[in-house]
A protein has these predicted regions:
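Detector for small/aliphatic-rich hydrophobic stretches
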Residues: 2-166, 359-360, 407, 414-415, ...
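Intrinsically disordered, low-complexity segments
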Residues: 282, 455-458, 471-474
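Short Gly/aromatic-enriched secondary-structure transition segments
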Residues: 106-110, 214-221, 280-289
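Extracytoplasmic/secreted cell-surface and envelope-processing proteins
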Residues: 102-104, 277-279, 312-314, 394-398, ...
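Non-catalytic, conformational "gating/processing" segments within enzyme and secreted inhibitor domains
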Residues: 24-28, 77-78, 93, 116-278, ...
């Protein structure tokens, strides 16, 4: 099962009651830049092609990657979970009321320049997602007495289904949040500042099921390597025969795997190779839609995947300022919303993510003629993930996991490891093949030791057997054992 939910809150307040609106501020009806093709340039109810949806999906991806690069990661905040889709909806709705340089700035941040009918295509994704396991809820809270332009309210409702509701109390807001997130985000707000006159809220909820589930009885404790010195104990989901699309990308120096979900969505994992890149250096080179298109056909392989249950809360003002949107928080032109001067006072974000074994069907029982043909994908080190809509290739959620069990105390590693991936994570198909062969042999301790990450010798210097026959010297005689090794923690019974 995959459970993701996110709430994005964008607050607007008065710049000051003593200030007057800019003279000659354009009315919403004549503020449309036809070259940018905002809401009034296209027909309502228009049907868009998959290619047009994928153009928007690419724009959402670039927005998400840019935000990921600007969010802090460290010991106190080791993981990041966000929804580029949710942020795109919030900023796009704000764009409906932005004018002049503020409108251009927002369109640039949304990567919407030169995209015809941007608002219409983005808004058309909402009913599209109703066919998947994704629910999108939006709401516009208005302070009673605040003079908002009717055109902004109507456009927000038409394009993004954002219902206008009176801003009465923090309790009412928190109750809505709790309801749309199925109780996962209670008490979202402590209070509402008196000068807040408008709140744009967006909630994205996804509860999906693996197309092929993991067997809970096989889940066992394993090591997740935080870095070359430290690891943490996690519950590791395992399968010997799991259908997966796996790509070894030499340019990224990473493995890319796609796990199918029910309902036309996929869970993409980008795992840096041992001793090569780390997640921070991979991000600037990442192109999720390109990777998605280059993934090979699905094949059966051995998989180790940590169970994850994480929560994430973050104010996005600093990250958005780093992305060039700092003027939103000082003196933007939002005269399409109201003639009263406004500014954005906060963008608050909360999310959770859970990975567990549940799925729609049992693990595939495809007959594997030889274990030598089975590859291994073992997620035992920091990784990047994305939940991708298969049709539009829009990343519904994205994140970085550097510690899937932040509440557990870290442990010192037994020996030298790569800087980003446990050393029994093979870097090529042949390495994975040798790793599988060694782990399948229970006849000798030397077979168990041959693929160990915790051996005292460096990974590149350890001898890797090519077959069970080689382990026994080709004539049934056991080779000399290396008793400095012990049985690997993540071995999976066939």
């Amino acid at each position: 099962m995959k459970l993701c939910l996110l709430l994005l809150l964008l607050c607007l307040c008065h710049l000051g009651l003593t200030e007057e609106p800019s003279p000659g501020a354009p009315d919403v009806s004549d503020s449309v830049d036809e070259e940018e093709d905002t809401v009034h340039g296209c027909r309502g109810g228009q049907v868009f092609s998959r290619e047009e949806h994928r153009v928007i999906g690419g724009a959402i991806e670039r927005l998400g990657l840019q935000l990921l690069e600007n969010l802090p990661i460290g010991p106190k905040q080791p993981n990041v979970i966000l929804s580029p889709l949710s942020l795109a909806f919030a900023l796009a709705q704000l764009t409906l009321g932005a004018r002049n340089e503020t409108e251009k700035l927002l369109l640039k941040s949304l990567h919407a320049h030169g995209v015809p009918c941007y608002h219409h295509i983005l808004g058309s994704l909402v009913p599209h997602f109703s066919k998947t396991s994704l629910d999108v809820a939006t709401r516009m809270y208005l302070r009673p007495g605040f003079d908002v332009k009717l055109s902004f309210v109507e456009d927000s409702l038409a394009r993004y289904r954002s219902q206008p509701v009176p801003l009465v109390s923090v309790e009412e807001v928190n109750q809505w949040v709790e309801n749309v997130t199925n109780g996962h985000i209670p008490n979202f707000l402590e209070s509402i500042p008196h000068d807040v006159v408008l709140m744009l809220m967006n909630a994205v909820y996804f509860k999906g099921e693996w197309k092929t589930r993991f067997d809970p009885q096989v889940t066992s404790k394993g090591a997740f390597y935080l870095d070359s010195q430290n690891s943490v104990s996690v519950d590791m989901m395992k399968s010997v025969h799991y259908p997966l699309r796996l790509l070894d990308d030499p340019e990224l120096e990473a493995q890319v795997a796609s796990f199918p979900f029910k309902g036309n969505t996929s869970f993409l994992i980008v795992l840096p190779l041992p001793g090569k890149e780390n997640v921070s250096s991979v991000l600037p080179k990442l192109n999720i839609s390109d990777l998605y298109r280059r993934l090979p056909q699905e094949k059966t392989m051995q998989v180790n995947l940590p169970k994850v249950k994480l929560q994430y809360r973050q104010e996005l003002q600093e990250a958005l300022t780093s992305m060039g949107l700092g003027s939103l928080f000082s003196g933007p032109d939002l005269s399409g919303i109201s003639d009263q001067p406004l500014r954005v006072t906060g963008v608050r974000h909360a999310s959770t993510v859970e990975l567990s074994e549940e799925g729609v069907e049992a693990s595939a029982t495809t007959v594997v003629t030889s274990m030598r043909s089975v590859s291994l994908f073992s997620v035992t080190s920091p990784f990047i993930f994305a939940l991708v809509d298969d049709a539009s290739l829009a990343p519904l959620f994205m994140g970085i996991v550097t510690n899937p069990a932040p509440d557990n105390d870290p442990m010192l590693n037994d020996g030298p490891l790569g800087n980003s991936t446990m050393s029994d994570q093979p870097t090529t198909d042949s390495d994975r093949e040798r790793d599988i062969n060694s782990k399948q042999s229970s006849k000798t301790e030397s077979a168990e030791c041959s693929s160990m990450a915790s051996c005292s010798a460096p990974f590149g210097e350890r001898e890797q057997p090519h077959s069970l026959n080689e382990l026994e010297g080709g004539n049934g005689q056991k080779k000399t054992e290396d008793r400095s090794c012990s049985k690997p923690d993540d071995s999976v019974p066939a």
